[in-house]
């Protein structure tokens, strides 16, 4: 089968997804992966900064296509969700169309679409969120997920505008925000609604503490990549979402 080649389109100041995604998929029992990134300039997570970043998408898609990936993940969740309900479908379709014009058959996923996909895979209706965003952007994320049919029971915005600083948010701060949520009637917790906010070491710990499925933008992205490649979803130590097919691979 060979090494599965994954393309990542990331904000220039994002370093976490390029750390957490390889760490996750390196645990897969049946496949090897390589990761190849292209970058869109962005430092401040604001409507203006996100719009300027999204304007660079076509250039980045052309560049990443040269690496001939099997799957491309558009790895900035809020940049898609600020576009309004259903934007992940439009972005994924536009990128796929651009790739096809250039002769690439790469599959296309987005962090925004992957989170929706992951929550549905967990059959979650009532959801709680921890986001790093300023409150107005966090409200757009909440509205986006509610438009997808989820009930956002409670949420927290850590209100960090500098994207480099988002990548340095301590795990203790993320867990403190999660503990402040009302999780009494929640089906799932998104402990990091952002691929730049580090959370991979927290997912299993939070699942044990809270007794509910816990996922992140990174684990949802890994789930979507594996499903797109028709690979078993069996990644240990990363939460219930990535154990969907563990019994199958064990047998």
Curated annotation (Swiss-Prot):
Optimum pH is 7.5. It catalyses: maleate = fumarate. It holds the Pfam family Amdase. InterPro entries: Iso_Racemase_Enz_sf (IPR053714), MaiA/AMDase (IPR026286), Maleate_isomerase (IPR028615). One of its GO terms (molecular function) is maleate isomerase activity. Keywords: Isomerase. The keyword Repeat does not apply. Its EC number is 5.2.1.1. The keyword Isomerase applies. The active site is at 76 (nucleophile), 194 (proton donor). Substrate binds at residues 14, 76-78, 133, 163, 195-196. The modification S-(2-succinyl)cysteine is found at residue 76. Homodimer. Reaction is initiated by nucleophilic attack of cysteine at the double bond, yielding a covalent succinylcysteine-like intermediate. HAMAP family: Maleate_isomerase (MF_00943). Catalyzes cis-trans isomerization of the C2-C3 double bond in maleate to yield fumarate. Shows a strict specificity for maleate, with no activity detected toward structurally related substrates including citraconate, mesaconate, dimethylmaleate, and maleamide. PANTHER family: BLR3294 PROTEIN. Belongs to the maleate isomerase family. This is Maleate isomerase. It comes from Nocardia farcinica (strain IFM 10152). The lineage of its organism: Bacteria, Bacillati, Actinomycetota, Actinomycetes, Mycobacteriales.
């Amino acid at each position: 089968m060979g090494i599965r080649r994954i393309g990542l389109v990331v904000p220039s100041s994002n370093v976490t997804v390029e750390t957490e995604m390889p760490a996750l998929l390196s645990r897969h029992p049946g496949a090897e992966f390589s990761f190849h990134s292209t970058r869109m300039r962005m430092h401040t997570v604001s409507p203006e900064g996100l719009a300027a970043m999204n304007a660079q998408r076509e250039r980045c898609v052309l560049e990443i296509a040269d690496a001939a990936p099997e799957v491309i993940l558009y790895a900035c969740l809020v940049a898609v969700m600020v576009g309004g309900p259903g934007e992940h479908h439009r972005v994924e379709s536009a990128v796929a169309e651009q790739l096809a014009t250039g002769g690439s058959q790469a599959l296309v996923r987005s962090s925004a679409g992957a989170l929706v996909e992951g929550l549905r895979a967990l059959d979650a209706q009532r959801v709680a969120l921890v986001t790093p965003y300023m409150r107005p952007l966090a409200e757009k994320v909440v509205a986006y997920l509610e438009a997808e049919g989820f009930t956002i029971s409670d949420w927290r915005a850590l209100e960090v505008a500098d994207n480099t600083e988002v990548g340095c948010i301590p795990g203790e701060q993320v867990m403190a925000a999660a503990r402040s949520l009302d999780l009494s009637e929640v089906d799932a917790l998104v402990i990091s609604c952002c691929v730049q906010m580090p959370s991979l070491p927290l997912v299993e710990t939070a699942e044990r503490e809270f007794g509910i499925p816990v996922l992140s933008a990174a684990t949802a992205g890994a789930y979507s990549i594996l499903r797109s490649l028709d690979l078993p979803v069996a990644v240990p130590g990363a939460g219930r979402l990535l154990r969907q097919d563990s019994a199958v691979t064990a047998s």
